[in-house]
Amino acid sequence: MTANELTTGDFTEASEPFSLFGTWLKEAEKSEVNDPNAVALATVDPDGMPNARMVLLKGFDERGFVFYTNFESQKGQEILATRKAAMCFHWKSLRRQVRLRGPVEVVPDVEADEYFVSRPRGSRIGAWASKQSRPLESRFALEKAVAEYTARHAIGEIPRPDYWSGFRIRPLSIEFWHDRPFRLHDRLEFRRKAPDGDWTKVRMYP
């Protein structure tokens, strides 16, 4: 085993996580076949039972990581109750993973409105037609609701439902993982005690 097999190179020298994440995401956009911005989102219900599902990251900056959803959905209700969540990105083509967790805030209305307007018209209709996470009688019932809202909003802009908006995870920890031979992977974690605090960098055993 050579020294090169035990070290990854440059990413462990990063001084803060957001620029590094941006670099990794851009590389994933070139190599991943589908949805490089897909991420597993973990929440917890009132009984402490965890739930996980895939969502799409719609933005990130030094404030945090943003996704949008129906606030009356299971994930919406769980986040509103706990104000905490975790994410895990896995880019198989690059053999990389990024995990993060922290408190969650609701994005400002103006930010949610801007994103909602950018969505395809059919997706905006769907936000009205789908009672997300609730029992559905049949596919026909969903398609009927879509047809009704399509007729209702046949002309003009489609307003954003009050129950549909975005969440921003403000991470207290972000871990970067890169696959290495013999399971001697590289792990680099950034930690802070508060959403606006300074980052501490820690290299972790695989």
UniProtKB/Swiss-Prot annotation:
It catalyses: pyridoxamine 5'-phosphate + O2 + H2O = pyridoxal 5'-phosphate + H2O2 + NH4(+); pyridoxine 5'-phosphate + O2 = pyridoxal 5'-phosphate + H2O2. Its EC number is 1.4.3.5. Pathway: Cofactor metabolism; pyridoxal 5'-phosphate salvage; pyridoxal 5'-phosphate from pyridoxamine 5'-phosphate: step 1/1; Cofactor metabolism; pyridoxal 5'-phosphate salvage; pyridoxal 5'-phosphate from pyridoxine 5'-phosphate: step 1/1. NCBIfam families: pdxH, PRK05679.1. Belongs to the pyridoxamine 5'-phosphate oxidase family. Transmembrane segments: none annotated. One of its GO terms (molecular function) is pyridoxamine phosphate oxidase activity. Substrate binds at residues 58, 115, 119, 123, 183-185. One of its GO terms (biological process) is pyridoxine biosynthetic process. FMN binds at residues 53-58, 68-69, 75, 97, 132-133, 177, 187. This is Pyridoxine/pyridoxamine 5'-phosphate oxidase. Homodimer. It is an enzyme of class 1 (oxidoreductase). It comes from Sinorhizobium medicae (strain WSM419). Keywords: Flavoprotein, FMN, Oxidoreductase, Pyridoxine biosynthesis. Its cofactor is FMN. It comes from the Bacteria. The lineage of its organism: Bacteria, Pseudomonadati, Pseudomonadota, Alphaproteobacteria, Hyphomicrobiales. Catalyzes the oxidation of either pyridoxine 5'-phosphate (PNP) or pyridoxamine 5'-phosphate (PMP) into pyridoxal 5'-phosphate (PLP). It holds the Pfam family PNP_phzG_C. Binds 1 FMN per subunit. PROSITE patterns: PYRIDOX_OXIDASE. Signal peptide: none annotated.
